Amino acid sequence: MKSQVQPKLIIHGGAGSSLHGKGGLEAVRQTLHAVVEEVYALLLSGVNASVAVVRGCQLLEDEPRFNAGTGSVLQSDGQIRMSASIMDGALGRFSGVINVSRVKNPIELAQFLQNSPDRVLSDYGSAELAREMQIPSYNALTELRLQEWIQERQDNFKRTMAGVIAEPELLETSNAGRGTIGVVALDTYGKLAVGTSTGGKGFERIGRVSDSAMPAGNYATSYAAVSCTGIGEDIIDECLAPKIVIRVTDGLSLQDSMQRSFAEAHDNKRDFGAIALDANGAIAWGKTCDIILAAFHDGEKIGDTLELAVGTQVGSIS
């Protein structure tokens, strides 16, 4: 009988500019740690990685502080359109929804599609799926995001994206919003899964597609799993998540795979971050931006990346 594996977990709430105000940083830390604590308890109880990933994404989507689910940013026309995907590493199966509106948890639609012959749906298909699933209509708008959009409309949308995090004292004043949430889990059976969800970059052209609903930003195999956050176009151009996972599959350690991928990203002036696990339980994160809002459980304790030095950096725990 195969012995059980020590589960591992890492989550993120986006990446962007450094947080201003210690009170705000501590609020973000408490939120991330609470999610890690709840989801890790599920993993210890024996649930599989995909179930844990969905639960983690639900909790993060329900937190108005982050740009996914409740608190998603508004697009140029003032509407919220969200995207999410999940990939089961053991099955090698990806599913997702693109630009869905009026649902509380887009990750639930992505999860449902895991067992569908049509596993990635655009806006109309996602809306029809929500009706088929009898998911109640939900307004994900928050007052902070509405005021952010109104201000940008008055300024004729000078910024190219919204703030990464919705805190009155923390709302970004530069083009630095990179809001996404993601969860990567290794369960007691040694299986990996990853989920990523986003409200988009904010103020974007109608129809823009996020990396969060593509393998480029959310990818897993039986060897490794990666969730990305940052400028979606940069993530797509680097094909970041598959690049890291394939390097692990080809024999590099997770740390070396992250180091090489982020060195290339730095040279290419990319703007993003990523979190990752491998099948051996190694935990890793990387960023080219100021900060990545990540927290993890290494099997013994909870840690986070909220106070890393500014600039390109990769870290890992074996």
UniProtKB/Swiss-Prot annotation:
UniProt-annotated catalytic positions: T180
GO terms for MF = beta-aspartyl-peptidase activity; hydrolase activity, acting on carbon-nitrogen (but not peptide) bonds, in linear amides
Q: Kindly state which keywords UniProt assigns to this record, in alphabetical order.
A: Autocatalytic cleavage, Hydrolase, Protease
In the record, biological process GO terms are:
proteolysis
Which Pfam family is one of those matched by this entry? Asparaginase_2
Q: What is its EC number?
A: 3.4.19.5
Residue ranges the record marks as coiled coil: none
Residues annotated to bind substrate: R208, V209, S210, D211, T229, G230, I231, G232
Q: Which reaction does it catalyse?
A: Cleavage of a beta-linked Asp residue from the N-terminus of a polypeptide
Query: Which branch of life, at top level?
Result: Bacteria
How is the polypeptide modified once translated? Cleaved into an alpha and beta chain by autocatalysis; this activates the enzyme. The N-terminal residue of the beta subunit is responsible for the nucleophile hydrolase activity.
Hydrolase as a keyword of this entry, yes or no, is yes
Q: Where is this site: Cleavage?
A: G179, T180
To which protein family does this belong?
A: Belongs to the Ntn-hydrolase family.
Summarizing the function annotation, the protein's role is:
Degrades proteins damaged by L-isoaspartyl residue formation (also known as beta-Asp residues). Probably performs the final step in the degradation of the reserve polymer cyanophycin (depolymerizes the building block L-beta-Asp-Arg). Also has L-asparaginase activity.
Its quaternary structure? Heterotetramer of two alpha and two beta chains arranged as a dimer of alpha/beta heterodimers.
Put simply, this protein is called: Isoaspartyl peptidase/L-asparaginase
Question: To which species is this protein native?
Answer: Nostoc sp. (strain PCC 7120 / SAG 25.82 / UTEX 2576)
Q: What is the lineage of its organism?
A: Bacteria, Bacillati, Cyanobacteriota, Cyanophyceae, Nostocales
